[in-house]
Amino acid sequence: MFIPLKSTQASCPEGNRYLDLAKKSGSQQDFSQAVTWLERSVESCDSYDAWHLMGMAQQKQRNLKEALNAYSQATELAPNDQSAAISIARYGQTLALNGQRYEALTMLERAMDMHPNPPSWIQNTAKQIDLNIVDQPISRESIKRSLSTQEFGLLANVRSKTKDGSKSETVSSRIRIPINFEYDSINLDELTQKNLAQLGAVLSEDKYRDRTFTLIGHTDVRGTTQYNHNLSESRAEAIEQELVENFPELKGRLKIKGAGESSPKYKGQKISEDEHRLNRRLEVFIN
């Protein structure tokens, strides 16, 4: 389904005319023609609407490289965080189609952080990817690509707008690693140990030698608040010890924090066991 956006384009009669023609072509499922009209629209005047719709039209045709470029352009031109979040989410959706699920999840989660009321399709897409990768090993290259996008790519250019229209500081780069402890314990399973080995290899690279990292442990929502806080701290400590043991150069550069159940990805007591598992996670912030 080709969903036209509510126009945010300033006065630009020629660009608007081509944009309207593109919407008509899209509604008729003629996405190739829609792209042609949208290319003419952005030639007349750059606009968020035209670039975002071009991303959707290219995505529909599985022209993934072109779709990623269009969504990136749209994000740069977004009039507000809400619009930027939608384009970032579509960018993530396109990455998933390209097999880059870990990087896709990074995009979708950032979009949900930015949007005041994320549409259900963003949440559902993120959850499905989350479920698909939770039992999969994470490669060093996936972690590096995710960080590169946050530090030098699309997300590096995203700022939250303040009331006066200026830009605030960027959000710290972060990595989220699925972790699986034995129930009510701090014992790491084999997959988590392998994922931490990939994480440690990245954090110990020369490019990060002057950086410190904050490890934040999260629990599921079962149990008392204080108990979960203590458990998350203990788990973060266990992860710190695992990393330092295998990567001594990280000693003294890791800070730990237990978030307990304060920031669940999936809220409520009556959620599935899979959702409880996804709430148990490690976030790594680069300071």
Name each region found by the language model.
Residues 102-212:
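Periplasmic peptidoglycan-binding/tethering modules of Gram-negative envelope proteins
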Residues 23, 56, 90-93:
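Residue-level recognition of tetratricopeptide repeat
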Residues 16, 49-50, 83-86, 120-121:
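Start-of-helix register in tetratricopeptide repeats
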Residues 218-287:
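Periplasmic OmpA-like peptidoglycan-binding domain that tethers envelope proteins to the cell wall
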